[in-house]
């Protein structure tokens, strides 16, 4: 168990190996208008 992190491994990390991913908003919070409409519907 190493107490100190191995910085050599971090410095030699190849960022090109990382895959580019498209970030997609999945759970967007409803607007105040949407919340009010839902309250009115009940």
Curated annotation (Swiss-Prot):
Tissue and organ distribution: Distributed in numerous types of tissues, including thymus, spleen, lung, liver and muscle.
Keyword Phosphoprotein part of the UniProt annotation: yes
Keyword Phosphoprotein attached: yes
A Pfam family the protein falls into: Thymosin
Phosphoserine found at: 12
Gene Ontology CC, one term: cytoskeleton
Keywords: Acetylation, Actin-binding, Cytoplasm, Cytoskeleton, Phosphoprotein
Protein family per UniProt: Belongs to the thymosin beta family.
Protein name: Thymosin beta-10
Annotated source species: Bos taurus (Bovine)
Taxonomic lineage of the native organism: Eukaryota, Metazoa, Chordata, Craniata, Vertebrata
Chain's gene name: TMSB10
